[in-house]
């Protein structure tokens, strides 16, 4: 059974210089731990993977929350004003309000980075998630996969004009890379820091991912020496991992993690 989209009203955020806004979400009732979907950069909660995972949770009687960040999908906003800090705040707001006890966070691409940042914040509050599924986790992507790889002329355009419109492999329309996006994200970089997440992590990665290369993810995994980490590699998988066989693997991994967490509790 489908779940209707609802809107969560948020007040003016003077710190982020945001007007009052609404975040769109779909919250499926069911058993704990809830599965919470954290989408990727410029993706939304109606994506193939998010929808398939919601359908699997419906079959299992499992609670599932998915939502759109500010200026994504059904959540209104000016993408030029959006930053990683805003999207992290959105995720934390949703998890705190609707996540229930010890949810499982499923983060795709940028959502993987946000899942890690959110976990650190939630642990400090004594309400950590019970596990993470990370799909092609784009940790520190704004700095290492964007800024560090941009030619000098593009960097200068971003610094001078405040924005550069990047051609998209997934859309006919280019999308804005803003100076505020790059500079704000620097306070959230974690790859050069000791990382100890403290909950089980399962990573799903395509070996032929051109956007978040497997070598990049291997580097991230090597920094998680103190954590319980599993990794499933799809040899011919790309970044999206949205083929039926990829979706089946994601659903299986998520179900297995939930089952193992329930057995251990």
List PLM regions with ranges.
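N-terminal cap/lid segment of alpha/beta-hydrolase-fold proteins
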Residues: 1-30, 243
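The serine-hydrolase catalytic nucleophile loop
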Residues: 41-54, 215
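Short beta-strand immediately N-terminal to the catalytic nucleophile in serine-hydrolase-like folds
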Residues: 105-107, 135
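Short beta-strand element of the alpha/beta-hydrolase
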Residues: 32-40
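Catalytic nucleophile-loop/oxyanion-hole region of alpha/beta-hydrolase
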Residues: 73-98
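The alpha/beta-hydrolase serine catalytic core
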Residues: 13-15, 125-234, 238-265
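Conserved alpha/beta-hydrolase
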Residues: 54-76
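Gly/Ala-rich beta-loop-alpha elbow adjacent to hydrolase catalytic centers
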Residues: 107-115
């Amino acid at each position: 059974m489908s779940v209707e989209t609802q809107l969560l009203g948020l007040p003016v955020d003077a710190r982020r210089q945001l007007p009052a806004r609404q975040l769109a979400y779909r919250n499926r009732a069911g058993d704990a731990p809830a599965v919470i979907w954290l989408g990727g950069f410029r993706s939304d909660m109606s994506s193939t993977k998010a929808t398939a995972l919601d359908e699997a949770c419906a079959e299992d009687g499992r609670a599932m929350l998915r939502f759109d960040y500010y200026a994504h999908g059904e959540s209104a906003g000016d993408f030029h004003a959006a930053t990683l800090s805003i999207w992290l705040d959105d995720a934390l707001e949703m998890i705190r309000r609707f996540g229930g006890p010890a949810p499982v966070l499923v983060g795709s691409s940028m959502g993987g980075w946000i899942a890690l940042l959110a976990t650190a914040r939630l642990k400090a509050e004594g309400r950590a998630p019970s596990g993470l599924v990370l799909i092609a986790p784009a940790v520190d992507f704004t700095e290492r996969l964007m800024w560090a790889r941009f030619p000098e002329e593009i960097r200068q355009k971003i610094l001078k004009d405040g924005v550069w419109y990047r051609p998209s492999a997934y859309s006919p329309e280019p999308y804005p890379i803003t100076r505020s996006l790059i500079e704000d994200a620097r306070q959230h970089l974690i790859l050069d820091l000791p990382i100890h997440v403290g909950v089980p992590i399962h990573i799903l990665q395509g070996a032929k991912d051109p956007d978040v290369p497997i070598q990049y993810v291997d580097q991230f995994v090597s920094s998680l020496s103190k954590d319980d980490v599993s990794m499933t590699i799809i040899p011919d998988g790309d970044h999206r991992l949205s083929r039926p066989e990829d979706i089946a693997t994601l659903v299986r991994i998520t179900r297995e993690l939930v089952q193992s967490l329930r057995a251990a509790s």
